[in-house]
Amino acid sequence: MNIHEYQGKDILRKFGVSVPKGIVAFTAEEARQAAEQLFEEQENPVVVVKAQIHAGGRGKAGGVKLAKSPDEVFDIARQMIGCTLVTHQTGPEGKEVRRLLVEEGMNIEKEFYVGITLDRATSQNVLMVSTEGGMEIETVAEETPEKLLKIQIHPLQGLQGFQARQAAFFLGLEGDKFKNTVKFITALYKAYTAIDASIAEINPLVITKEGKVMALDAKINFDSNALFRHKDFLELRDISEEDPFEVEASKSNLNYVRLDGNVGCMVNGAGLAMATMDMIQLAGGKPANFLDVGGSASPETVEEGFKIIMSDKNVKAILINIFGGIVRCDRVAGGVIEAAKKVGLDMPVIVRLEGTNAEIAQKMLDESGLNLIAANGLREAAQKVNEALS
């Protein structure tokens, strides 16, 4: 689950991670009042107005601006709230700005990158630091890997003091700046583990001219599978930032991810879903979604998934690929039939069913009177999808 920058900073602050003073605003007037409060409390002659959306690249898109007075903050906020911000992470449709973070300005001397996430290749958390703060870390890793240090963290031992010092040495810091950075990294790891985050990224981490170490930006994502331990974090969820199809799917406990293709997919099992998407691509099509109905799918959840797929206007054909192990094929067939009758079929639907009660399911589909195309294998199913689209 993703949260906004200001929410992430509020959480990090509780664990001793240094972050600038900031106030969230939902209107231009609230932004002005926030600026008045910050100017009274700080010596810096500027504040920063930052659009709050679940995407990076806001600065280049005009979503981060400096202001020297409350009136200037008001004017910026009036232009920014309600506008659509398009970044390299939002896609061409962009995201509407509904809230802002008004934050104290910083006298920046140096910028770095610090992040902690899970390295799936080693099944360990990894601390990453780079001297190239403010840049996309993927770009740094690809173009200048010598400027990125990765430190594996043993799951039983946790982050060790020498590892935090190693990271600070890599950044070329000395004296109080070195000590403060070690303290910062240690606090960040403490927060990362305590809240069950999947990523805690500070980009940039800044050293101010006064010697302070501060998180100028913060990206915190939670492990959704651990949210049962942090029910208060569910209140931080901003549904308006999420894809409406994915929100609807989550209500039925469906694993759905929207893509930009034209072939809707309904599959049971993440591995089979990935293989199905690959086969569609190889056959000349393009997947419109990832949808795993899971092993305990009921006719109701299948029906809901089918409706969600058909609600996507980009979908021109649907491939249903079910291997019945735990989930019974007749359950899936029942859900498809009910959904098709309620929504109406106006596109080709290719069905491949194998496993538990596959013959019963096929008979149900044959007797339904619906225009469904049967396939006897995954490759054949993908080819029939491509034929239906041509």
Swiss-Prot record:
Enzyme class: ligase
Positions annotated to bind substrate: N268, G325, I326, V327
The keyword Ribonucleoprotein is assigned to this record: no
An example Gene Ontology biological process: succinyl-CoA metabolic process
Residues reported in the UniProt entry to bind Mg(2+): N203, D217
Alphabetical UniProt keywords: ATP-binding, Ligase, Magnesium, Metal-binding, Nucleotide-binding, Tricarboxylic acid cycle
Assigned GO CC terms: cytosol; succinate-CoA ligase complex
Note on how the cofactor is bound: Binds 1 Mg(2+) ion per subunit.
Documented EC number(s): 6.2.1.5
All copies of domain ATP-grasp, residue ranges: 9-248
Function (record text): Succinyl-CoA synthetase functions in the citric acid cycle (TCA), coupling the hydrolysis of succinyl-CoA to the synthesis of either ATP or GTP and thus represents the only step of substrate-level phosphorylation in the TCA. The beta subunit provides nucleotide specificity of the enzyme and binds the substrate succinate, while the binding sites for coenzyme A and phosphate are found in the alpha subunit.
Subunit structure, as described in the record: Heterotetramer of two alpha and two beta subunits.
UniProt name for this protein: Succinate--CoA ligase [ADP-forming] subunit beta
